[in-house]
């Protein structure tokens, strides 16, 4: 799983199901693909979204700011700063400073995420606030590790009563990951389509898959409902690749 796919998975796992979730997923995809580089418009859109908690808005604002690199000099937004202040608790700020010093020594996404997971959500949010307010700097990869650790903490607290102790984290994150991977696979199918008769068939399958993912995000579904979605798509893609003589490994 690529870094941006992982970030998208974790961030979407804390967004409540509904039309807004599908909209946010599309915004994230566009930002990560470099198709949306207007940070000011993105932030204004995010600020006025209903339903989302201030912390979720803060995390999304932080991710948008990290990703739209050409706009890093833009003025910081108050709604993000307020969300990432650790509820104004000085203990959170103290822990955030300690975490920041540890993160400065990390160079990988997974290393940063591992370190961050031992801190509370308030301390993690405060640490994001330090970075957002330019009081500290880390690599984008390390910052994304911090984001995903925060989302995992939030998702865990939302689903603690249902949590299964398995290596692939909680059901909500697994569910979101299947949908993100299904979307990614559908995109790959569309890019490979060409102009043959089979290509039209594959385009149709990919289009249906994208619509299904959007519908699942909009209406909300049980975490187990997406289990077969990615596998069905991968099977279709691999069958198509065999027919076209394309290497399969690339999309596993």
Swiss-Prot record:
It is found in: Virion membrane; Host nucleus. InterPro entries: Flu_matrix_M1 (IPR036039), Flu_matrix_M1_C (IPR013188), Flu_matrix_M1_N (IPR001561), Flu_matrix_M1_N_sub1 (IPR015423), Flu_matrix_M1_N_sub2 (IPR015799), INFV_M1 (IPR037533). SUPFAM superfamilies: Influenza virus matrix protein M1 (SSF48145). Most abundant protein in virion. When expressed alone can form virus-like particles in transfected cells. A motif (Nuclear localization signal) lies at residues 101-105. Coiled coil: none annotated. It is a peripheral membrane protein. Residues 165-252 are annotated as: RNP-binding. GO terms for biological process: viral budding from plasma membrane. Homodimer and homomultimer. Interacts with NEP. Binds ribonucleocapsid by both interacting with genomic RNA and NP protein. May interact with HA and NA. Cannot bind NP without genomic RNA. GO terms for molecular function: RNA binding; structural constituent of virion. GO terms for cellular component: host cell nucleus; membrane; virion membrane. This is Matrix protein 1. It comes from Influenza A virus (strain A/Duck/Czechoslovakia/1956 H4N6). It holds the Pfam family Flu_M1. Residues 1-164 are annotated as: Membrane-binding. The keyword Cell wall biogenesis/degradation does not apply. Plays critical roles in virus replication, from virus entry and uncoating to assembly and budding of the virus particle. M1 binding to ribonucleocapsids (RNPs) in nucleus seems to inhibit viral transcription. Interaction of viral NEP with M1-RNP is thought to promote nuclear export of the complex, which is targeted to the virion assembly site at the apical plasma membrane in polarized epithelial cells. Interactions with NA and HA may bring M1, a non-raft-associated protein, into lipid rafts. Forms a continuous shell on the inner side of the lipid bilayer in virion, where it binds the RNP. Belongs to the influenza viruses Matrix protein M1 family. Keywords: Host nucleus, Membrane, RNA-binding, Viral matrix protein, Virion.
